Structure formats: C-alpha cells, structure tokens
C-alpha cells in the first residue's frame, strides 16, 4: 500500500463486485506490479485483478525485428505496453541512489526514498537479478572526475547501478508475472480501462473495454 502511494498507481477498492474482485489495479507496469506484490506479502485476502491494455510478457514481440521499421502496432505497441511496461525490453538498469530518477526524495524525504529503493532492489534480487553492482569500488577515480566536474560548473552524481541486461530483465519480470498469477492475482490483458465508476468523490470501480465493470 505504501508503494502504491509513492508511485501513484491507480488502486481501486470495489464495493459493487461484477468482476469478482475486491481490488482493481489499472496498469501492469512497475507501480502496478509492486502494488500487487506488496498486498500479497502483507497477507491480503482481497481478490486482486490487474487490468492491462497490452499483452502478457510471453506474448509480447515487436515485428520491427523482422521488418526493420516500426509497424505502428494496433491497438497497442508491444514494446511500451504489456506486463512490466517498457522495462521488459530495456537494458535493465536499476539506479540504486535516490539522487537520480525523479523528485521522490523531495516528496517523501531522502531517507524514506532510499529505503524504498533498497526494498524494491531486494525484490528484484529475489527474482533473479544479477547481484553485481556497477559504479562502486572506484572511489579515487570518482573523486578525480568530481573535482574536474566542479571546475567545469557541473555536479557529478555517484550512482550505483544494477545492470540486469535485456534478457535477464525479461526473465525477472516473467518470474514476477508467474508469481502473481500463481498466488491468485487475476490478470486481464488486452483490456483497457475506459472510465471510472464514481459516486461523488469516491471511486467505486472501472469500466473496461470488454464491457465488464
């Protein structure tokens, strides 16, 4: 629940249950994935549904590999949508310092931001991420480069990186997908959230592209 709060994932509790769900998570990107994982790890007995307009990870493939040009896939791009979002086909670099990557430290404080990064990193390790970290153990080189950067009016941010690589990132996310399914999370792929069901200021559910709610 705290990861959901930090990353702003759409986290909906349903009172009118027409999909046999207590909780709907819209989007199976990192925020949605970690929300579902956190609920399971905290012993939630709620029926969880994830709604994702892209495909399951094992069914995602880009035709550009064969055609050499973007085919503008419809209804959605296989690279940017689907389980784990664009991260599944990235080079899998995880920045492990709160000084880079956004304004989370400003919003919640540096200590809590770093604790959250460390917590998420441990989960990646549990699912098979490489234990080696780049960017550590070169203190003297970093010191010299930082001194040169200061003279040039620049700020050097020393950030450790866990580099999974494209294939390993794919395997890690596939393992997480199977874990969620095996632990009862129901996934609606190729399904888009079209609208919210509102009662005053309270969200009671969602309307989906397949007609369900």
Task: List the model feature ranges, each with a label.
Residues 1-18:
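Short, Lys/Arg-enriched N-terminal segments with co-localized hydrophobic residues
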Residues 19-31, 49:
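Beta1/beta-strand and adjacent pyrophosphate-binding region of the FAD-binding site
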Residues 20-21, 209-213:
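Core beta-strand elements of the Rossmann-like FAD/NAD(P) dinucleotide-binding domain
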Residues 20-22, 159, 190:
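Phosphate-coordination loops involved in phosphoryl transfer and adenosine-cofactor binding
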Residues 36, 40:
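Gly/Ala-rich phosphate-binding loop of Rossmann-like dinucleotide-binding domains
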Residues 46-52:
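Short beta-strand "acidic-cap" motif of Rossmann-like dinucleotide-binding folds
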Residues 53-186:
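Conserved N-terminal/central alpha/beta ligand/cofactor-binding core
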Residues 189-202:
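A conserved short coil-to-beta-strand element within the FAD-binding core of flavoproteins
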